[in-house]
Design a protein with these regions (language model features):
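N-terminal chloroplast transit peptides
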Residues: 1-14
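Metallocofactor- and cofactor-centric catalytic cores in central/energy metabolism, strongly enriched
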Residues: 27-353, 368, 372-374, 380-381, ...
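Conduit-forming functional cores of very large proteins
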Residues: 358-359
Length: 398
């Protein structure tokens, strides 16, 4: 997402009453007095973004990273070969965002809102993030938990367009996985123009979220339906952290599923086989990590998400010293919870080491939190043994 997002109230503060009625084209082509602080601020935020698209015409309107919907000016429509392919009216991004959020609020349920937002992301990525950033509190539960869990359960039924990259057990070699991630420079027949083609549409990847779908939220093994988790998590990377969408890569490692309901589901989009385990599984993960490092460099961030308990800790220990990676369920959740507990100490006036902790559940998240709580109590002077004595984990058997 390029540029900054202005809230209406802030825009009203900067615009004079006459400027509010200018069209987008008039507004952007007006003469600016850069000595005026207000006009300079507006110029920086709303100056025209000069991008030469790699496609034109209908293909441009089908490219979510380039499509601006009805915000294309007349000159842009004529130059890019889309004049006549859009309705004749012109709408600013703000107007389009208002239309989207108004329609979302009239949907009958959260899953319908998720489907509509998913379609918008496929159609106009910049508008999708504009709507999301302007309505974070309202839309975060739609884009991610809890609605994404329901969407994953019904992913085969609501599936529209592919998002992310699927690495299967049949791609179990560094060269095959690298081929999927590749970004090749090709030439047109007359060698007068260059264009890029690839399995994945962007080359400069800085953040990867990967899951094998074995333990999706609290819903269990959802197999290939788990792709909704990396997609949703990276949408939050963009909306909350300002990461460029083109730097993000959602990945689903498909090694099958042990969920018989999915294997019997006629709409299931993944491999119809039981999960691969053992050395073959480990080799696939090793090859995936090597291919990512080979393609995107040592510093590419790889976030492990919703792996099963038996693999989550093991893979974290296996890769943490050699790759820029972390497990969100173990480390990400734990860091947030411990930060909250540390904030509570300001109210209770007690150190964390002066309290005992009971966990309802003994999954990856609970164990990760417990380990980080123990580390914090050790930092406060307790021995590891004394710190562990203050931790109680209640598993499914009580």
């Amino acid at each position: 997402m390029l540029g900054s997002v202005l809230k209406t109230s802030r825009l009203d503060m900067l615009l004079s009453s006459s400027e509010r009625f200018l069209s987008t084209t008039q507004f952007l082509t007006r003469e600016w007095n850069l000595d005026d602080p207000k006009q300079k601020a507006l110029y920086k935020l709303y100056r025209a973004e000069r991008v030469t698209p790699s496609v034109r015409g209908v293909d441009l309107l089908k490219s979510p990273d380039l499509n601006k919907g009805m915000a294309f000016s007349l000159q842009e429509r004529q130059y890019l070969g889309i004049h006549g392919l859009l309705p004749p009216a012109f709408m600013t991004e703000e107007q389009q965002a208002y239309r989207v959020i108004s329609k979302l609020r009239k949907q009958p349920n959260d899953l319908a809102r998720y489907i509509q937002l998913d379609a918008l992301q496929d159609r106009n990525e910049k508008l999708f993030y504009r709507v999301l950033c302007d309505n974070l509190k309202e839309l975060m539960p739609i884009v991610y938990t809890p609605t994404v869990g329901l969407a994953c359960q019904q992913f085969g039924f609501i599936y529209r367009n592919p998002k992310g990259v699927y690495i299967t057990i049949n791609d179990n070699s560094v060269s095959k996985i690298y081929q999927i991630l590749r970004f090749l420079l090709n030439f047109l027949e007359n060698f007068s123009k260059k264009f890029f083609s690839s399995n994945w549409k962007f080359n400069e990847i800085k953040a990867i979220v990967v899951t094998d779908g074995e333990r999706i939220l609290g819903l269990g093994d959802l197999g290939a339906y788990g792709i909704g988790i990396p997609v949703g998590k990276l949408a939050l990377y963009v909306a909350l952290a300002g990461i460029q969408p083109r730097w993000c890569l959602p990945v689903l490692i498909d090694v099958g599923t042990d969920n018989q309901e999915l294997l019997d589901d006629p709409f299931y989009i993944g491999l119809r086989r039981n999960r691969v385990t053992g050395p073959e599984y480990d080799t696939l993960l090793d090859n995936f990590m090597k291919a990512c490092r080979k393609k995107y460099g040592q510093n590419v961030l790889i976030q492990f998400e919703d792996f099963g308990n038996k693999n989550a800790y093991r893979l974290l220990e296996r890769y943490r010293d050699d790759y820029c990676m972390f497990n969100d369920d173990i480390q990400g959740t734990a860091s947030v919870v411990v930060a909250g507990l540390l904030a509570c100490t300001r109210v209770t006036k007690k150190k964390m080491s002066e309290s005992s902790y009971v966990f309802l559940g003994a999954g990856g998240a609970a164990l990760g939190i417990a380990e980080m709580v123990v580390l914090q109590m050790q930092n406060e002077g307790l021995s590891k043994e004394d710190a562990c004595s203050k931790i109680y984990l209640m598993d499914v058997d009580g």
